[in-house]
Amino acid sequence: MKVKALILSSMFALAGCDKMGQNAQDALPNPSAAQEQAAEQAYAAFKSIDFEQLYTYFEPELKADFIAHEHEMRKFAKSIPQQEITNKKIAAKYIEKSSDKPSLYLVSYEYAYGNKNLVKYDVGFDKAGGSNKIRKFDVKVFGASTN
């Protein structure tokens, strides 16, 4: 009986934590229309290996970092699925504040593809509703095949 009560109370506690986490996500603002558009167009440029276009969305520091590692970035961009995206959503939003770095508003997107691939795409801006220049750009591919 005590074990059942302990398990039940643990389930309620975990459900409450999940609800609190969702409320915290909902409290953060969504990206502005300009930020959303920059994020989508930057992902499309990366996916199509159009780095000249991609760099137009970046802040100077991120652009310099990409240029320094462009060969590796081009190889990785080829692994991005080329099929149509079947589902797209904002998975998470974060605000990072640090005394030694500028603030960062990070939005995590999940792009699902019909061939059972999932792309997690993190894009960072200075703040929610702020500049549409990208400060952080990270892409991860999950799945069986990229063809």
Regions found by a protein language model. Give the residues of each.
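Sec-dependent bacterial lipoprotein signal peptides
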Residues: 1-15
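Non-catalytic interaction surface on structured domains
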Residues: 50, 68, 78, 127, ...
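Short solvent-exposed beta->alpha transition segments
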Residues: 37, 52-102
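Short, low-complexity N-terminal intrinsically disordered segments enriched in polar/charged residues
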Residues: 17-48
